[in-house]
């Protein structure tokens, strides 16, 4: 399973990339706004750090505007993936961009049928939001299982990006289900590396080393 980092914070991206576990990056307008920088500048800098798919989201709500934005974004770097909302206009734009050979990531997916529509429209990636579903007492990981089954049944090549990840258990379940990608906040990536027994073991080794004659 591939790990994308879900952030527009260049410092976090750089640090996670140095761990050797980051295969790509997902951003959205909210994450870009937190950076306080120009959209294009942030995307350009990220593209220079991670050699993998970089999802950059359009903000237009209608087809022609989405296409216009997408054509400008892909000029920034060959690794740019256009992030589109799961709406009828977003599906139209997905079809158009797919025909042009431009990679797409259909986002804000909350049902298996939305994922199926996106795959049929030619999406490169689909992004179901598990955490937001959990927040309203629905089974976020359950829809990942259903999407995986549907795509496998019919041979759809769209990759499943598990998004809105809130904790390490979401990552574990994504891997067990067979999702293609988990896009993970920096804080959760760091949690994945931690275990109290690891820390205790290191502490014990160092204490014992101090007893070794020098």
Swiss-Prot record:
It is found in: Cytoplasm. It catalyses: D-sedoheptulose 7-phosphate + D-glyceraldehyde 3-phosphate = D-erythrose 4-phosphate + beta-D-fructose 6-phosphate. HAMAP family: Transaldolase_3b. Transaldolase is important for the balance of metabolites in the pentose-phosphate pathway. Its main location: cytoplasm. GO terms for molecular function: aldehyde-lyase activity; transaldolase activity. The keyword Transferase applies. Keywords: Cytoplasm, Pentose shunt, Schiff base, Transferase. It comes from the Bacteria. This is Probable transaldolase. The active site is at residue 83. It comes from Geotalea daltonii (strain DSM 22248 / JCM 15807 / FRC-32).
């Amino acid at each position: 399973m591939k790990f994308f980092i879900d952030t527009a914070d260049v410092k976090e991206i750089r640090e996670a990339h140095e761990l050797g576990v980051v295969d790509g990056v997902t951003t959205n307008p909210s994450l870009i706004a937190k950076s306080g920088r120009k959209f294009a500048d942030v995307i350009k800098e990220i593209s220079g750090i991670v050699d993998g798919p970089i999802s950059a989201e359009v903000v237009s709500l209608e087809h022609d505007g989405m296409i216009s934005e997408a054509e400008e974004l892909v000029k920034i770097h060959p690794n740019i993936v256009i992030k589109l909302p799961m709406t009828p206009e977003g599906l139209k734009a997905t079809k158009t961009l797919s025909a042009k050979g431009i990679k797409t990531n259909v986002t804000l997916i909350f049902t298996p049928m939305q994922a199926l529509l996106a795959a049929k429209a030619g999406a490169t990636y689909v992004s179901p939001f598990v955490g937001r579903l959990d927040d309203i007492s629905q089974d976020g990981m359950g829809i990942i299982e259903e999407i995986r089954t549907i795509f496998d049944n019919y041979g759809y090549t769209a990759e499943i990006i598990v998004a809105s990840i809130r904790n390490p258990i979401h990552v574990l379940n994504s891997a067990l289900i067979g999702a293609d990608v988990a896009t993970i906040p920096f804080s959760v990536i760091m949690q994945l590396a931690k275990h109290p027994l690891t820390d205790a073991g290191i502490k014990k080794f160092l204490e014992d080393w101090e007893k070794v004659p020098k």
